[in-house]
């Protein structure tokens, strides 16, 4: 880290010629501290992912596994809510498997209350693929979707989300949608996380861009564990 500070000081000294040395040194130390904190945070995240992966691979009960996938992803991102969809390829749909929301006290699917909500179609009759629904779009493209505020999002239909909010008094805002890819790189499900919260203030914030790749890694571990359990059964 000393070399990083020295390098920043050298660069800053050239870029800020004429500025007192103590100011340059102070700025360099501040930048180095931010780099240090980011690196430590990344290491902690990687350690968490390893622990989560081991936990998922050792789970023997399908209901507990599904619940744990959502719970671990929510804990990792500090998300208020999470939904897990399982893809039914033969019928071209996404079935609700797990729905969790701390603020609303909702814990459905798995070993909890049965989910009676209609499935999400991946195709819309003769109109082709369903890219209006964000989870269907994620399943079809295999790409993550990170939205700061669903009420301002373009390209997707969030009327159902607005209706849900109106009926419950909730306010859906930030959303991260991640595909679950198995060992053959096939999308077997979709993980949707809702309303990331600042760990210090509790305010709803966007999902950090640097966490997307790590959540995708978590989702891949979840998909492999789920596929393994299906094969064993």
Segments from the language model and where they lie:
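Regulatory loop-to-helix N-cap segments in sensory/regulatory domains
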Residues: 2, 6, 10-18, 37, ...
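Signal-transmission linkers at sensory-effector interfaces
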Residues: 2-64, 68, 75-76, 98, ...
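Signal-transmission/dimerization alpha-helices at domain junctions
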Residues: 30-34, 140-144, 190, 212-233
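Short, hydrophobic-rich beta-strand element in sensory/regulatory alpha-beta domains
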Residues: 71-74, 80-88, 92-97, 135-137, ...
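GAF sensory/regulatory domain recognition
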Residues: 83-129, 152-153, 191
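Signal-transducing coupling segments at domain and membrane junctions
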Residues: 131-136, 143, 148-174, 196-208
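A short, aliphatic-rich beta-strand micro-motif
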Residues: 173-182, 187-189
């Amino acid at each position: 880290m000393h070399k990083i500070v020295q390098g920043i000081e050298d660069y800053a000294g050239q870029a800020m010629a004429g500025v007192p040395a103590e100011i340059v040194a102070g700025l360099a130390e501040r930048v180095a501290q931010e780099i240090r904190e980011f690196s430590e945070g990344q290491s902690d995240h990687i350690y968490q992912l390893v622990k989560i992966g081991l936990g998922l691979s050792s789970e023997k009960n399908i209901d507990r596994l599904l619940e744990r996938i959502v719970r671990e992803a929510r804990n990792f991102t500090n998300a208020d809510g999470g939904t897990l969809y399982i893809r039914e390829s033969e019928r071209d749909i996404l079935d609700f498997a797990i729905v969790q929301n701390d603020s609303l006290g909702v814990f459905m699917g798995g070993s909890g209350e049965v989910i009676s909500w209609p499935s999400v179609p991946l195709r819309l009759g003769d109109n082709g693929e369903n890219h209006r629904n964000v989870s269907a779009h994620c399943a079809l493209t295999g790409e993550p979707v990170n939205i700061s505020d669903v009420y301002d999002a373009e390209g997707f239909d969030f009327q159902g989300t607005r209706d849900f909010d109106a009926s419950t008094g909730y306010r859906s805002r930030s959303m991260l949608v991640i595909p679950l890819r198995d060992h053959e790189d096939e999308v077997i499900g979709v993980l949707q996380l809702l309303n990331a919260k600042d760990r210090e203030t509790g305010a709803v914030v966007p999902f950090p861009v640097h966490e997307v790749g790590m959540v995708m890694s978590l989702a891949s571990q979840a998909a492999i564990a789920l596929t393994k359990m299906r094969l064993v059964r």
